[in-house]
Amino acid sequence: MLAARSTHDVLNQAPPLAPYNVFDADLVLREALEREGGGWGVDRLRDTGELAGSVEAIEHSERCERNEPRLRTHDRYGQRIDEVELDPSWHWLLRQAVEREIHSLPWRDPRSGSHVVRASLMYVWSQVNAGVMCPVSMTYSAIPALREAPDLAEEWEPRLTRPSYEDGALAGMAMTEKQGGSDVRANTTHAEPAGDGNYEITGHKWFCSYPPCDVFLTLAQTSAGLSCFLIEGSDPGFRIQRLKDKLGTRSLPSSEVEFHGVRGRLVGDEGHGVRTIVRMVNHTRLDCLIGSASGMRWGLAQAVHHARHRSAFGRLLSEQPLMQNVLADLAIESEAATATAMRVARAYDEQDAPFRRFATAVMKYWVCKRAPQHALEALECLGGNGYVEESGMPRLLRDSPLNSIWEGSGNVAALDVLRATLKEPEGLPAFMAECELARGGDSRLDAHLDRLGDLSRDPEFEARRLVGDLALALQASLLVRNAPPAVADAFCAARLEGGGRVFGALPAGVDAGTIVERALAV
């Protein structure tokens, strides 16, 4: 009789990366935090990083992704209730973000570097779950717009910035309509004076993210034109029609809503709603940039960890030249995105308005556009294991296009940059002055800077290429000034000399081993 044999032993599989400290493992973030003025937040980041890389946090994230939100429009008696049911793990994740003041830190503690520290916290916690950061971002971003109405700010800002999930409040936005999309001036929702200084708003919104928010900023037409209003989610005229069945961020309820005589309170000047709400939009665009950089970082960490523990054809993947090329290319893309996100966040601390507005628009376009390609290549580094839901890589890939669509898709973002050169002529010179700080540090960057033309004279047809060239100039400048020579050299070689059609096409001579070693400090 044959002896019993096992079908197989589990060999040559990478061990789980968790538990690990997301912050401590990220040398690039640690350096950027210090460089951009947020060094005082190290302990806060280390504490958040430990939780973000814990098995507990990862399990909560996986659970709320499996148990998607569900809308109950009516109770058993037929009464309208519009209740969104969310998994307890969603509340756990959101509570952690609120208690760590990711939604409010710069407004509660406006010292130098607070936007950088807050951006770093956003970057770390986004690696746990991207969907949960949407209400966090909107609440953070609503404050500058709300301050256009001092009485409303006095009433709501204390609650919106409170680091308490139970006693605080969350803010959302509702701008997009069926017929207009990003063209909010085509909105048909209208607001009529109610006779008490407020307005009655009637209409619809095609996208309203996180309808459980306590308050929303929205746009509606008045006799003076498009205006910005604050509405409350508890208003009986605020009706959730359905939840969106989306490609990604499936833990996050996004909805269609109707306003049936909802009470609205004017924010800013009547007829100047776009000018008012853009104060919110600029901050959410910053968070789109941070979120995409965070996704790149998470994908890179998974790819490098896998390659360090997986062997093929007699060698670890991380020791094989072509895999080193791919990993190094992913690493320089991630480092450039992280460095840029933190530099732009510093501009919010410094109130450097011309650079801040222009750089936010440029880098939101570029980094968010690069994220899906980066996610796909990181997934492929894990082979078939990366194609399986349990790895988390499919979720990363599904989530990655969102930030390029939110707050203006690629074309809208690129055209905004061109318009900014005309409407805010000080923006481009401020941006170029930052790029020029690296002049003389690398001949390839110098040549790239010389090639950049006057955007105000270029047609819309070339907008994406032009804005991409600007983005690469800033990224290369930051790396030449601040990154190790191996990183800066590889980036300039791959991004400024016409190569890099796919990740993993770095030219010969780059120090891929050094770059990959730097990528994950565990």
Model segments located where?
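C-terminal helix-coil-helix/basic helical segment that borders enzyme active sites and/or dimer interfaces
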Residues: E335-W366, L379-E380, G453-A463, V467
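Internal helix-loop-helix
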Residues: G78-G168, C208-Y210, S334, D399, ...
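A short core secondary-structure module
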Residues: N198, T202-F238
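Flexible, small-/acidic-enriched active-site or ligand-binding loops
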Residues: G237-G261
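A glycine-rich, basic-preceded beta-loop-alpha segment at the flavin cofactor/substrate interface
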Residues: E256-T284, A301-S318, P425, H448-E460
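Extended, charge-enriched "interface" segments that sit outside catalytic cores
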Residues: M1-R111
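C-terminal catalytic subdomain
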Residues: L396, S400-R439, V467-Q475, A483
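C-terminal amphipathic alpha-helical interaction region
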Residues: E424, L437-V522
